[in-house]
Amino acid sequence: MNKEIISKIVKASGVSEGELVLVHFWGEDADKDIANHFVTSVAALGAAPVLLQQARSINRDIFLSAKESCFDDRYFDLFSKFDAVLDVFAYQPVVLGYSIENEHMLLYRRYMSQLFHKLAECRRFTQIRVPTEANAAESNLEPQDYIQRMNKAYNIDYEMVKKACEHETKRFAGAKKVTVYTGTDCVLSLDLTGRTW
C-alpha cells in the first residue's frame, strides 16, 4: 500500500480541517511506516493526528506487568475526544498472539472491550485492512495475489463511488425491500424498513 493510496483512503474517510483523528494501528514496528503514512495524510488535510499502536509484542509486555489501576475511566475518557478513528490493521486486530496467565488475559480483554466501546462513540470509525502477508494468511490466497488484489481494490476513485452511492440512495428512497439476484437460485433479499440512509 503506497502513500498515494493511503492519502486517497484518508480523504475518502471524511477527514477534514480542524478535526482530531486517532490512527489506531494494529502492527509491529516493522510495518510502522504504514501507520506513519496515515498520520501524515491526516495532517496534510489539516486535521490533528494521534497515533496509538497496538503491537502484539508490546501489548504482551504491557499486560504481563499491568495492574487493574493502569486503565481506569480517566484513560478511556481520553478516547471520547476524537472526531474520527482510522482503525488500520497490518494483522488481525485484538488477537494477542501470545499465551499469558489468565488474570493478565482477562485484563487485556477488558481493556479491549472498554477501548472499543469508547472508540465506537466517535462520529466516524473507518477500518482499513492493509495488504500484508499476515492478512493474506486469513484470505486463502497466495500472499502476492492477495496484496495485488487489495492494492487494486483500494486504488479507486472514491469521489465517483460516493456519488454513485448517493445516486442509488436517492433511487431506493422509500423502498421497503431490495432483492439481488446473482445467479440461478441465488437470491439475497434485504429488508429496508426503517432504514436511515
Predicted regions and their residues:
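Active-site bordering "gate/hinge" segments
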Residues: 1-197
